Swiss-Prot record:
It catalyses: Endonucleolytic cleavage of RNA, removing 5'-extranucleotides from tRNA precursor. Gene3D superfamilies: 3.30.230.10. This is Ribonuclease P protein component. Its EC number is 3.1.26.5. It comes from Prochlorococcus marinus (strain MIT 9215). Keywords: Endonuclease, Hydrolase, Nuclease, RNA-binding, tRNA processing. It is an enzyme of class 3 (hydrolase). Belongs to the RnpA family. One of its GO terms (molecular function) is tRNA binding. Consists of a catalytic RNA component (M1 or rnpB) and a protein subunit. HAMAP family: RNase_P. RNaseP catalyzes the removal of the 5'-leader sequence from pre-tRNA to produce the mature 5'-terminus. It can also cleave other RNA substrates such as 4.5S RNA. The protein component plays an auxiliary but essential role in vivo by binding to the 5'-leader sequence and broadening the substrate specificity of the ribozyme. Coiled coil: none annotated. The gene is rnpA.
Length: 128
């Protein structure tokens, strides 16, 4: 299941902001870049104030897998974990999260991938 639209990060300005203003947490399989949210950067056509919430993006390089099917499978696995554990996320502090997967052969090891993801979520203080 995909992330809801109000939880997705997109746009060059948003990613440039995250790369410049983020705290980086490294793991063996992935890297987290966590930045405080800045709603002024987002282009929203609606006048609602839902842009100051937790948002995330998952970037998976072709170095991880040449097949888009496998990269999308990894993305769906991480998004599914996030949606099932959404209540644990500290929503009182609006953050933007960019997840970059490092290259390696872990496409078949779902448990290792999810364990690393959860450890980095704790390490970055995004979940309690």
């Amino acid at each position: 299941m995909a992330l809801p639209k109000d939880m997705r990060l997109k746009g060059h300005r948003t990613f440039n902001y995250i790369h410049k203003n983020s705290t980086i947490y490294h793991g063996k399989l992935m890297t987290f870049k966590v930045a405080r949210s800045n709603p002024e950067i987002l282009f929203t056509h609606k006048l609602t104030n839902n842009s100051n919430k937790f948002r995330m993006a998952i970037a998976i390089s072709k170095k991880v897998s040449k097949k888009a099917v496998e990269r999308n499978k990894l993305r769906r696995i991480l998004q599914e974990w996030l949606l099932t554990n959404i209540k644990k996320i500290n929503n009182h502090k609006p953050y933007w999260l960019l997840v970059n997967l490092k290259f390696g052969d872990f496409c078949n090891d779902k448990s290792r991938l999810l364990e690393e993801f959860q450890n980095l979520m704790f390490k970055s203080h995004l979940i309690k």
